[in-house]
Structure formats: C-alpha cells, structure tokens
Regions:
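Glycan-processing catalytic domains of CAZymes
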Residues: 1-372
Length: 372
C-alpha cells in the first residue's frame, strides 16, 4: 500500500497518520542508557524490509550513560547510516521523567541553552538539585540518586530543551517527553511545558532535517483533549488477562487507565505501545487490578508467548484498535528491554547468523503493515 511520507516545515494530518501506521519501537540504534544494539546493520535491514517508517525510542537515557558528547555523536553517526537506508525514516529520541544525579552533574550546559532562556552563559554543569521535584525520596525510580524533574524550575526546562535540541541535531525528527503530568505536577495549566515545547519547536524549525519535530508524551485524561502541545498521544496498551486461558490477553475499553477511553475525547491520532516497567512478585499469575500482564510488563509478556500466539495477537490488536479508532495505531514491538531472562532485549529480527537471538516476528510485522 503506497503512502505519502513527505513533509517539510509542517506535517499534514494525512502524513502524520501514515507515519504512525508504520511505527515500531526500536531501542538501541543510538544509546539506550549505556548500551546499544549489537545487531545494528541487521536491524536496519529488518526495518526497511518491514516497511517501518517511524522508529520509536531510537535513542535515550533513563539514568546512567556515556558522557553526552559521546552519546550524541554516536547517535548522529548511526542515524545518518539509517537515513542512507531510507531517508524517510523518522527516528525518535526520548527525554524522560527520570534524572540521575551523577549523569546530570557531569553534563555541561552549552551556551546556546542559556541564551535560549535569556540568561548569560556560565561555565558549569547542570544542577540536579536545581531541577528535581520536591517531596520525593532519593530513590524514586528504584535506584539511588534518582528523581523526577520539575518543569516549573528553569533548570529542568533547560535540561529538556538541551536534550531535545541535541537529539534534533543528531538527526531525530521526533521527541517523546515521558510522563508529562508527573513532571508537570506543579504546572497544572501546562504553562511551563508549553514554553519548553515552543522553544523545542522553534529550534527544530531551523535545525531539524525537515524543519519540523513530532512531539508526544504519555498523556492522561483531559490532556488527551488538548490540541495545542502535542502532535499525537501515546500510552501503554494496558492488557487485560483472560484468567482461564494462561498467558492470553485482550484489549478492553475503559480498562484501568488505558488510552481506549472514548470519554477522554481523543482529538489527535495516537499510538499504543508494548511498555516495559518490570515484573510483579508473582510472574505467571493473573491480577486484573494491576498493570502487569500475567505478572510481566507488556513487552516481557509478549516475548514469553509462543510464535503462533504472537502472530495472532499482533493481528488481533491491530484490527481491534483500527476498528474502533480510525486514527489509532499499534506501535509494533521491534527491539525493547525485557524484565529478566537471559537476554537484555526482545528483537523482532528473523533469527539468523546476523541476529541469532531474534524472535522472528519480522515477517508478521511486515504483513500487518502491508494491509493497514
């Protein structure tokens, strides 16, 4: 099915939906914290073969990583190689809701960041304490010296702008901003968020490959009705277990806090993704009151299903979403970290010498893309 992927300076609703209809999550093309894909060339082969166009979570830092100069240079080199394979690829980077003191404190603030906020440049690194959200424990994200940034604080605004700008310079044309409601706890009218997003968009209008950047976040409730900040919404799937059918799940409207909630008045296209967030204390046991799927996060659950059921489920969820939401799309799992197991990540690649650990879901994804 031929689709239009052309844009420059702005993006039409049609082209945006075309990209989202070909979205995958593929971590590690750039740095994924301090690791990266060890099957890079086969990953690019797979993405091209599938017909993927929007490559989600291609680069990000959650907590610790290599120094930023090295990380951004690495991303720039790899994304340039990706654009040799397909110049229409959109690579997405993430600036998340977790900050880690040692990483933040060794990251210099470039002069252009001060200037973007009307400040005199200083020779210093970012300040963890000047951007953290008050009232949280020092291990809020499950490891010491982590915190949530507070978007009402200028230092946090500079941090988000800086990271987005550097990823844009590296070749990214999409930025995911994480749990914006949590980061914006003290910004109920999203005044500070809008200021930061406006700065990112102005930077992209000059420096991005096609003079535009797609911006999304994990949005909740009323924010999904807002049409001023984000290009599209994104959220985990929120799988509902079938208790009498081990390891099987379905989608259901208004289940927990899922995106599938017509009362939220979705005014923009959206993606649902196979999220990663760990596993429960009772893996393999259903609990309909939790966000886990049979005790696992969504991508780990998917990776543990057999090949036939994975094929069945990808087709099922694609049809279920498309039948109910004309502008709703499933972000196909391509490469994402797992909770436990012998391998750090799930890979959809067809198993071969180039990717001996692949789950061989590549052709299923290609088939889904080919009919939607």
């Amino acid at each position: 099915m031929q689709k239009n992927f052309t844009f420059d300076g702005s993006i039409s609703r049609e082209v945006l939906n075309n990209y989202l209809s070909r979205a995958v999550t593929h971590c590690g093309l750039g740095y994924d914290n301090d690791v990266y894909s060890d099957t890079f060339e086969d990953d690019l082969r797979m993405l091209k073969n599938e017909g993927a166009k929007f490559i989600g979570r291609a680069a990000y830092v959650w907590h610790h990583s290599v120094p930023d100069r090295e990380g951004f240079a690495f991303a720039k080199k790899r994304l340039a190689r990706g654009h040799e394979i397909d110049p229409e690829f959109i690579f997405q980077a993430c600036v998340f809701e977790c900050i880690y003191r040692p990483f933040v404190s060794r990251t210099p603030v470039p002069a252009y960041v001060f200037e973007a906020f009307g400040l005199v440049p200083e020779d210093r690194c970012f300040s963890f304490d000047a951007m953290k959200l008050s009232g949280e424990p020092d291990d809020v994200w499950g490891m010491p010296q982590t915190a949530t940034p507070d978007i009402t604080r200028t230092e946090a605004q500079m941090w988000f702008f800086y990271r987005a700008a550097e990823y844009i310079k590296a070749g990214c044309e999409a930025i995911h901003l994480g749990q914006v409601c949590r980061i914006g706890r003290e910004d109920p009218d999203f005044i500070c968020w809008k200021l930061v997003i406006d700065k990112i968009r102005r930077f992209a209008s000059i420096h991005a490959r096609r003079h535009y950047v797609l911006i999304d976040a994990h949005t909740l409730g009323w924010l999904r009705q807002d049409d001023t900040m984000f290009d599209y919404n994104a959220f985990p799937i929120r799988l509902k277990e079938i208790p009498d059918k081990p390891m099987q799940c379905v989608c259901e409207e208004e289940y927990l806090d899922s995106m599938f909630n017509p009362r939220d008045g979705l005014c923009r296209p959206f993606l649902v993704e196979f999220d990663n967030f760990g596993r429960s204390a009772f893996p393999g046991i259903p609990d309909p009151s939790s966000h886990f799927a049979w005790g696992y996060d969504e991508i780990t659950w998917f990776s543990k299903c057999d090949a036939d059921y994975r094929t069945q489920f990808l087709n099922y969820i694609t049809d279920w979403v498309n039948e109910r939401y004309p502008e709703g799309w499933v972000q196909m799992p391509s490469r994402r970290c797992l909770a436990g197991g012998s391998r750090y990540n799930y890979s959809a690649n067809t198993r071969s010498d180039a990717c001996p650990h692949g789950w061989t879901d590549e052709e299923t994804i290609k088939s889904v893309f080919g009919r939607t």
